[in-house]
Regions:
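Interfacial helix-cap and linker-helix signal at transmembrane-aqueous boundaries
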Residues: 42-47, 74-75, 160-169, 225, ...
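12-transmembrane solute porter fold
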Residues: 14-31, 35-37, 264-430
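Transmembrane-helix exit segments and adjacent C-terminal regions of multi-pass membrane proteins
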Residues: 2-10, 464-528
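Helix-loop-helix hairpins in multi-pass membrane proteins, especially solute transporters
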Residues: 70-209
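Extracytoplasmic
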Residues: 12-71, 106, 121-122, 292-297
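Central cavity-lining transmembrane alpha-helices of secondary-active solute carriers
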Residues: 57-73, 122-127, 315-328
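MFS-fold secondary transporters
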Residues: 94-99, 114, 188, 355-363, ...
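Hydrophobic transmembrane-helix bundles of small-molecule transporters
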Residues: 166-280
Length: 528
């Protein structure tokens, strides 16, 4: 049990402690999306491909997940004040180094260190926030705030990044983040005294070998999911090696956890069928959430919206997420049946997917995409807190911490899996539609001939020779076919996913055990 009465300076009012804790937890949550917020710019700055940016982001997230399994030991070893000061100082050093790195290898190393550092303060800060909201609804309030900020962070970061790049250089974005960390450092020094949270535990009991094995299998698995399609899967030696490492190290990790006295992850938590159902819902949710990248790619590649304009538009989605989180918290407090919250979320996601299907065309205005774009955020915000609490409900009290770790690990794999599935579906469908449409570009097709003649005449009128004009006409027509193939592929993806979400919505409504499980958790935590 955390003893919080003595770790804060006694002369500080309660509201100041709450405000300080909230401010100190925000930077770690926002930094997760700092480099990925403008992946195109960062990729060009480092001379790498967008897939490389996705890989580095996944590495950061994977290292964060692995570190979550051991961060409690670090928090028990150090006094809270020294622990948080050390984390802030390390973050400042890594951020400063990141501002001057142009080498991909060093960038990857720094991103993995980022993931390690960002995982350390989370558990302590959330537990401290729980103690500042002692009511029976305190957990709902804290979780709702935490996930609201997490879901809205892409919009916040994108807006700040867009403004920074419009006014200054990319490095100023890093300098701004360093400034926030310095302010957080000052607040920590002001809030905490040198007393400890709990009894000190030695670090030699930490399973560092298991941690290294876990990081290795996460890196290998992420590499396969991100680069598999680009490297033609099993035709590439590095993909085969990645799969081999993943299988071997997964076996080693499972064996070690089953035989260890102090496992990083207790596999008994997965015996609950309801917990596995909750994790499955997370996977489906994140696959649907990955479609947001398809929307953003269309905005940039087809509609040619500028980065700053796109950053402003993302506030619509963030508003939906915030609204969903607030509605979910209100419904939980009012004892609303949780399975209907899940069903409503999946139903709203299906509406967004099917609606957006009709928006994949060459010209679209903000007024047309605003409502479905808002609904996507509303769907995700509505389900996040209830689903987390539902997963926690499956764990016995002595395994509760492993319930949260299972949820976090599933979100990591669901993020990578969602990227992999959507990306591969896009490539396959775009290629299929391109081949199909290209077959119509023949000398016997009057529409194709008319289009080519018009384009050729246009280029000739601009001063090109007939030969050059013909080549440019073919290139422009080919670009048009590729754009249409891209849009048609997106339409198919969104249609099929809408059907999947409708099916899961029906299955949720027919399930009789979801509400019973949540009632058990509600009685345990809220006492009613």
């Amino acid at each position: 049990m955390i003893k919080t009465g003595s770790i804060f300076r006694e002369w500080l009012p309660g509201w100041a402690i709450k405000a300080g804790l909230i401010f100190c937890i925000l930077p770690a949550m926002l930094l997760l999306g700092l480099y990925n917020s403008n992946s195109t710019y960062t990729a060009s700055y480092l001379g790498i491909e967008p897939e490389d940016m996705q890989f580095t982001m996944s590495l950061t997230y994977g290292t964060l997940i692995a570190t979550m399994l051991i961060e409690q030991r670090f928090a028990r070893f150090f006094a809270a004040r020294n622990y948080l000061i050390g984390i802030n100082l390390l973050t400042i050093v890594v951020l400063f180094a990141s501002a001057f790195v142009k080498n991909m290898t060093m960038f990857v190393v720094l991103r993995m260190i980022d993931g390690f550092i960002m995982a350390l303060p989370g558990g302590v800060m959330i537990q401290l926030l729980f103690t500042r909201f002692p009511s029976k609804f305190g957990r709902v309030i804290v979780y709702s705030f935490f996930y609201c900020v997490l879901l809205c962070s892409p919009a916040i970061i994108n807006f700040l990044v867009g403004f920074t790049l419009d006014q200054w250089d990319w490095r100023y974005m890093i300098y701004g983040a360093i400034g926030v960390q310095i302010i957080g450092l000052a607040i920590i020094i002001l809030l905490f005294n040198n007393k400890r949270l709990e009894r000190k535990l030695p670090l030699y009991q930490v399973d560092f070998a298991g941690y290294i094995i876990l990081v290795a299998l996460l890196v290998a698995g992420t590499y396969v999911l991100v680069y598999g399609e680009k490297r033609y899967w099993l035709n590439a030696w590095d993909i085969r090696l990645g799969i081999t490492i993943f299988i071997i190290f997964s076996g080693l990790f499972i064996t070690r956890q089953k035989t260890s006295k102090r496992p990083l992850f207790n596999l008994d938590i997965l015996k609950s069928a309801n917990l596995r159902s909750g994790l499955l819902l997370f996977i489906i949710l994140y696959i649907g959430r990955a479609t947001l990248n398809v929307c953003h790619a269309t905005m940039v590649q087809v509609w040619h919206w500028e980065q700053l304009y796109l950053a402003k538009i993302q506030w619509i989605n963030a508003a939906g997420s915030a609204t969903g989180v607030i509605i979910a918290a209100t419904l939980l407090i009012r004892k609303f049946p949780v399975k209907y919250i899940f069903a409503a979320s999946f139903g709203i996601m299906a509406i967004y997917l099917y609606w957006f299907r009709f928006l994949f065309k060459l010209e679209v205005g903000i007024g047309e995409i605003a409502l479905p774009y808002y609904l996507q955020g509303l769907s995700v915000g509505l389900i996040f807190t209830p689903l987390i609490m539902f997963i926690l409900a499956q764990a016995p009290s002595h395994l509760a911490i492993f319930g949260s770790r299972a949820g976090a690990s599933t979100r990591f794999w669901a993020t990578s899996l969602g990227f992999c599935l959507i990306h591969n579906a896009q490539v396959f469908l775009q290629r299929s539609h391109y081949i199909s449409l290209s077959r119509n570009i023949t000398a016997t097709n009057p529409l194709a001939e008319e289009r080519l003649s018009t384009l050729t005449a246009t280029f000739i009128s601009k001063g090109y020779s007939s030969g050059a004009a013909g080549q440019l006409a073919y290139k422009q027509l080919d670009a048009s076919i590729r754009t249409q193939s891209f849009l048609l592929g997106n339409m198919e993806i969104f249609t099929w996913l809408a059907i999947v979400f409708i099916i899961f919505m029906i299955l949720i409504l027919l399930n009789k055990h979801l509400q019973q499980t949540y009632n058990l958790f509600r009685n345990r935590v809220f006492g009613y």
